[in-house]
Amino acid sequence: MALISMRQMLDHAAEFGYGVPAFNVNNLEQMRAIMEAADKTDSPVIVQASAGARKYAGAPFLRHLILAAIEEFPHIPVVMHQDHGTSPDVCQRSIQLGFSSVMMDGSLREDGKTPADYDYNVRVTQQTVAFAHACGVSVEGELGCLGSLETGMAGEEDGVGAEGVLDHSQLLTDPEEAADFVKKTKVDALAIAIGTSHGAYKFTKPPTGDTLSIQRIKEIHARIPDTHLVMHGSSSVPQDWLAIINEYGGEIKETYGVPVEEIVEGIKYGVRKVNIDTDLRLASTGAIRRFLAQNPSEFDPRKYFSKTVEAMRDICIARYEAFGTAGNASKIKPISLEGMFQRYARGELDPKVN
C-alpha cells in the first residue's frame, strides 16, 4: 500500500514544480471522488481529517476509510494528514492511529480559538516535530491567523479558528518570523497567512492584491526556499455551483473564493499544499438539491449520493490538472516511514534558511 509521508510527496512536488490539493474527507463519497479523480489523472493524493471531520466521523472511521482507499488504489501514493491539531497530544494520538502527517497549529491556544504568542507556537511545534520525526511522520506548522484582509475578521470552520477582529500583523505572516520559526522548529511545511479564510465566505468581491497577498508568498519563499508553503482556506467557490444551489432552494449570499490562477501563481513560489474543502461541499450540496428537485419521488440515498461523487470528482480533476499534480503519481517511489526517520536522523531534511 502506498501510504507515504507528506514530506516525500511535497519534496517531489518541489522538484518538479507542481502543487498538491489537500482535500478534507468526512465520508465515503468524498473519499471515492478524490481517489477516482486521482486514478483518472495519475495524481498523488493528500487527504486530511479536520477537527470537525474527526468529531463527525471519528478518527478510527476516517483512518479505515482512507486505508480502504489505499487498498483499492494501491498504485496511488497517499498522504493521510491530520489537519489543525490543537496540541501535541492530539498529534501524538493521530500518529498512533497511523497518520503519516500531522499539523500542529500552534498559532492558536489549545482551545482552537485564542491567538497564541510566538514563543508558545515555537514550543509546541518543536515538541511535535521531535516525536513525529522520530516516527518518520511529517509536520506542518502554522504562523499567522487565517482571516480576511478585507474586513479584519478572523476565519473559523469546524470549531478551529481565531475569533473577532485581527490586525494585519496577525493576518499576514512575517517573512523574518517565518525564517526564525522554521529554523527553530524544523517543520516540513508551513501554513502561512496571506488573506485567505476558512469557509465559503472569503471575499465579498473578486480578490485583489489588497485582499489576497501573493506578494507575501514570494517574500516568504525567498527566506525559506526548502520549506514547503501551505495555503489554507483555498477553495475557489465555483460560481456555477452557487447558482445551482440557489436555483434549487438554497440561500447562499454572493461570495468569492481564491481564484485558481492565483493559486497557480503561488505554486511558482513555493506553495506545495493547497487546502480545499468548501468547493467539494458546494458541489455535493448542489448535486443533491438538483437531483431531489428533479426526482421528487426518489428516496434511495445511493442515487443522490452517486451524483455527489460525480460532482466532486469533476472538481478534483480540475484542481489536479490546474495545479500540475496530474501525471506525477506514477513517478513517486514510496519511501517507508522508517526510511524517512533515517533521513531525518542523518540531518538530510534539515531546512535551509536564507
Curated annotation (Swiss-Prot):
Coiled-coil annotated spans: none
Biological process according to GO: glycolytic process
Binding of dihydroxyacetone phosphate, residues: 199, 233-235, 275-278
Cofactor binding: number and manner: Binds 2 Zn(2+) ions per subunit. One is catalytic and the other provides a structural contribution.
Pfam families for the chain: F_bP_aldolase
Positions annotated to bind D-glyceraldehyde 3-phosphate: 50
Entry binding sites for Zn(2+) 1: 84, 198, 232
Binding site for Zn(2+) 2: 105, 142
Active site positions: 83 (proton donor)
CC cofactor: Zn(2+)
CDD domains linked: TBP_aldolase_IIB
Reaction equation(s) it catalyzes: beta-D-fructose 1,6-bisphosphate = D-glyceraldehyde 3-phosphate + dihydroxyacetone phosphate
Enzyme class name: lyase
E.C. number: 4.1.2.13
Keywords on record: Glycolysis, Lyase, Metal-binding, Zinc
Presence of the UniProt keyword Zinc in the record: yes
Pathway(s) it belongs to: Carbohydrate degradation; glycolysis; D-glyceraldehyde 3-phosphate and glycerone phosphate from D-glucose: step 4/4
InterPro entries: Aldolase_TIM, Class_II_FBP_aldolase, FBA_II, Fruct_bisP_Calv
One GO MF term: fructose-bisphosphate aldolase activity
SUPFAM superfamilies linked: Aldolase
Functional note: Catalyzes the aldol condensation of dihydroxyacetone phosphate (DHAP or glycerone-phosphate) with glyceraldehyde 3-phosphate (G3P) to form fructose 1,6-bisphosphate (FBP) in gluconeogenesis and the reverse reaction in glycolysis.
UniProt similarity note: Belongs to the class II fructose-bisphosphate aldolase family.
PANTHER family: D-TAGATOSE-1,6-BISPHOSPHATE ALDOLASE (PTHR30304), D-TAGATOSE-1,6-BISPHOSPHATE ALDOLASE SUBUNIT GATY-RELATED (PTHR30304:SF0)
Protein name, entry field: Fructose-bisphosphate aldolase
